[in-house]
Amino acid sequence: MQIRGALWTTMALFLSLGAPVSASASDFPPVLEDIIGRSLGLAQLAQLALADDDAVARAARLRLRAAGPEGLRAFERAHEAALTAAHDAVLAAAEAPQDRRDPADLADPARARLLAALDTVCGQRDCLLSRLYWHTDLDEAVRTARREGKPVLSLRLLGDLRDELSCANSRFFRALLYPDPEVRALLRDRFVLHWASERPAPKITIDLGDGRQVVTTITGNSAHFVLDAGGRPVDVVPGLYAPAEFVAVLQRAEALARRTAVLAGDDLRDALADHHEARVRALDEALKSQALVTGQRPVPSPRAARPGAGDPRAGQAAPLAISKMAVEAPLLGATGEPVDRVAERWERIADVMAPTIALSRASLGLMRTQQWRSGDASRDATDRSAAIVALRRTLALDTLRNEQEIHREIHGWWARGATAPADLQSLVRRVYDDLFMTPARDPWLGLADPASYGGLVGGGRRTQVHL
């Protein structure tokens, strides 16, 4: 079907104004009806999603997205060969020579257009390796969950999951968790997925004065909230985990959500309390075993860190997400913000755990396509190997602390006599305020500490009005 010029624009406008996904010819303006003469279903929209005309392509992509997972499946069917080739190229990039600057040919215009369309339909950046559909309307996600009898996995993050510069943990989710074959299958088959932004992701730009800049995010955290098919929260998976541990935690949460979906009142409270109290006991036993393996004496059950009076500092919040801290700690230090140390006991256990952490070939390939390169192939190969070793260690630390400190405290919220928030938004607020140390009342996210002096008027903090 060849349609050009103003007709493309007419079709784009018509689609964007809400024509039915399977519109019949009579639904179209006469000029389109004369040329198309048949229904425009998901298969046709999938072809139009890669149209040369940007307006048409965008309208078709948004219509596919509005069709939900069926729209994603239609796009996959229409472009399976190209998607498979791109997927295989990213996997092959894991072993590509360091002198190849674009080992998966992601800059190729046709491939870039294909992947941009896929990301739009999925609702997630870097969707090629996961092919997951994310709802951004919680009510729609819960309706789908009720219809399919599945739990909801609701991700809360800083920033937008479709943007490169969403918060660091969400970027690690896209690179290390969602592409993992076991994680991907579990999320696709057993959950209805949803994400929402808690607040914009704070960004920092370092201008080196010669045209070079470093642009990244700073501070913030993410969590996956597990809801039953009715939208009631039953658990929270805080921050980043190694892939295998993430699967194990989600499998337990899924079983809980399915088991309690038919319960209410005291029966529901008792079932939730039984589960979460059992998890605390299991964490106690795991901690004893981990301590003995590393030659340490068993220690009292840990609690998540607590700030003193006033709003918490960003440097206190940073160690709550170790992998993220590896990226952000040098930048926090540059702003004059001291970063709290990680307890030695976690460091010693992480040294034992780190070599056992398995990263999928998909993740390693994606990392290779994103890695900064100096141009010296031998140095870049050494740096990449060192980066993977360091990443495994920070993943081990993240997994330990998130499960033994933060998740332990969350389990306690559902124990008998405790008061876990019954609605999702109150639970989100409690996690961010009390555990992630990024309370909504602090617009500066702990980055404006009156107790720190840097020789700048107003501490270098400014407020711009966005009209």
What is each residue range found by the language model?
Residues 27-133, 146-147, 247-467:
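Non-globular targeting/processing and membrane-anchoring segments
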Residues 67, 152, 225:
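Ligand-binding pocket scaffold of soluble enzyme catalytic domains
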